[in-house]
From Swiss-Prot:
The protein's name: Cytochrome b
Any one GO molecular-function label of the UniProt entry: ubiquinol-cytochrome-c reductase activity
Membrane topology: Multi-pass membrane protein
Organism of provenance: Ovibos moschatus
CC cofactor: heme b
Function: Component of the ubiquinol-cytochrome c reductase complex (complex III or cytochrome b-c1 complex) that is part of the mitochondrial respiratory chain. The b-c1 complex mediates electron transfer from ubiquinol to cytochrome c. Contributes to the generation of a proton gradient across the mitochondrial membrane that is then used for ATP synthesis.
SUPFAM superfamilies: a domain/subunit of cytochrome bc1 complex (Ubiquinol-cytochrome c reductase) (SSF81648), Transmembrane di-heme cytochromes (SSF81342)
Gene: MT-CYB
Length: 379
């Protein structure tokens, strides 16, 4: 009798994706982040579901309902902090996953890569709307500032902002719709993640060398299931260390003050994972220019496959490109730091230089480095 795993219509899909999947034998721990992102997503949906059972999306009670979750609901505090810090872990894994793709040339799988860029944008949108829900000072002013950026769009901008707000300012209608979108988007992300996997399994995984590995494949289970479990345990350990010891380390103290439209916080800034994009936005002294730079800072990822000039796929054997990659990482860390600083000298000029460097490295220096390496190897 044939194994049910290979014949049952549903089990067959699971089998081909997670059990009998032919996988390169040499993929490193950088390939763990896909499964970690899946775990983060499931964790966020579960904790979010339990939070939604007690949360009220009304401006008068939203802040109190979050306080109520932390004080009165059984284990509400741990659910709330797992959800808040889970978002941080999600973005750490996302950045590592994208970085891995850039370093090892995984972006040459065009459909998989573009699907990933869409997933990144949707996750960012979800996280932004989730940050508004506790209705603290930073929630309110973050929502006001970021949605207001759309008013920079010529002709339709103002109408668009008022349409998103559901009124003439961020108010009850805004909070309610943000809650609705924040609830539905993760399920859309799950569906898109499945499409992402579908595209990946059409081509098979890349590997650190960037060389086709069809001659040396091993089954996903047990080799990579056990490896993913190790990664998952490290992820959960890190998350729980954050949650149980320093739950507010990555948050903003201003968000423990209820939203007040009459009092602007001295420094409006988003969560740490948006600071690099926020720094790029602020570095341009023109509203529309800033918004375009903000969009481009993420959408530039979709251009990367077309900027690949090297004859080799991976950066494993390309030292000049490696230098460029780590320069980009250092630049992003600089931008993240600048995004959290006030708009004053010398932070303004550092932010502007770091923003120029960001686009320069991706659009000019990396393709140039690849061409130089091709010539050095007489290719």
């Amino acid at each position: 009798m044939t194994n049910i795993r290979k014949t049952h219509p549903l089990m067959k899909i699971v089998n081909n994706a997670f059990i009998d999947l032919p996988t390169p034998s040499n993929i490193s721990s950088w390939w763990n982040f896909g499964s970690l992102l899946g775990i983060c997503l499931i964790l966020q949906i579960l904790t979010g579901l339990f939070l939604a059972m007690h949360y009220t999306s009304d401006t008068t009670t939203a802040f109190s309902s979050v306080t109520h979750i932390c004080r009165d609901v059984n284990y509400g505090w741990i659910i709330r902090y797992m959800h808040a810090n889970g978002a941080s872990m999600f973005f750490i894994c996302l950045f590592m996953h994208v970085g891995r793709g850039l370093y090892y040339g995984s972006y040459t799988f065009l459909e998989t890569w573009n699907m990933g860029v869409i997933l990144l944008l949707m996750t960012m949108a979800t996280a932004f709307m989730g940050y508004v829900l506790p209705w603290g000072q930073m929630s309110f002013w973050g929502a006001t500032v970021i949605t207001n950026l759309l008013s920079a769009i010529p002709y339709i901008g103002t109408n668009l902002v008022e349409w998103i707000w559901g009124g003439f300012s961020v108010d009850k209608a805004t909070l309610t719709r943000f809650f609705a979108f924040h609830f539905i988007l993760p399920f859309i992300i799950v569906a898109l993640a499945m499409v992402h996997l579908l595209f990946l399994h059409e081509t098979g995984s890349n590997n650190p060398t960037g060389i086709p590995s069809d001659t040396d494949k091993i089954p996903f289970h047990p080799y990579y299931t056990i490896k993913d479990i190790l990664g998952a345990m490290l992820l959960i350990l890190t998350l729980m260390l954050l949650v149980l010891f320093t739950p507010d380390l990555l948050g903003d103290p201003d968000n423990y003050t209820p939203a007040n439209p009459l009092n602007t916080p001295p420094h409006i800034k988003p969560e740490w994972y948006f600071l690099f994009a926020y720094a790029i936005l602020r570095s341009i002294p023109n509203k529309l220019g800033g918004v375009l730079a903000l969009l481009l800072s993420i959408l530039i990822l979709a251009l990367v496959p077309f900027l690949h000039t090297s004859k080799q796929r991976s950066m494993m054997f390309r030292p000049i490109s490696q230098c460029m990659f780590w320069m980009l990482v250092a630049d992003l860390l600089t931008l993240t730091w600048i995004g959290g600083q006030p708009v004053e000298h010398p932070y303004i000029i550092i932010g502007q230089l770091a923003s120029i460097m960001y686009f320069l490295i991706i659009l000019v220096l990396m393709p140039m480095a690849s061409t130089i390496e091709n010539n050095l190897l007489k290719w």
